[in-house]
Amino acid sequence: MSVDFSSLAQQFTEFYYNQFDSDRTQLGNLYREQSMLTFETTQLQGAKDIVEKLVSLPFQKVAHRITTLDAQPASPNGDVLVMITGDLLIDEEQNPQRFSQVFHLMPEGSSYYVYNDIFRLNYSA
């Protein structure tokens, strides 16, 4: 299975953050029951629990600005690892928060789903 992992990562990242920024409730289609999210130190498993966590975040408006995106194949089966860094603009805040996020995408038929998702805010030392 030959995958253009760079294009896949770019397309996935654009879709994911556009969806997150406009309507987080719709992100459930990207996860499965075996999917896991580590959000800061909280670990959740399953699409339902993951979306509940994302929807419960304490802000109304959010915008992700990507500064770096790296991807590489993760297995001979077509899995792809995606690492993103960027800025998070929350509500009307003028100072963005830095973040890092890693996705492990697994093939499913002709598409992919998020098997692992690790999110971390990056605070200055």
Swiss-Prot record:
Give the matching Pfam families.
NTF2
Q: Which residues form the NTF2 domain?
A: 8-121
User: Lipid biosynthesis: present as a keyword of the record?
Assistant: no
Biological process annotations from GO: nucleocytoplasmic transport; protein transport
Could you name the Gene Ontology cellular component terms for this entry?
Answer: cytoplasm
Q: Main site of residence?
A: cytoplasm
Alphabetical UniProt keywords: Cytoplasm, Protein transport, Transport
State its location(s): Cytoplasm
Instruction: Give the matching PANTHER family.
Output: NUCLEAR TRANSPORT FACTOR 2 (PTHR12612)
Q: Name the job this protein performs.
A: Facilitates protein transport into the nucleus. Could be part of a multicomponent system of cytosolic factors that assemble at the pore complex during nuclear import.
Q: What is this protein called?
A: Nuclear transport factor 2
Q: Which gene encodes it?
A: NTF2
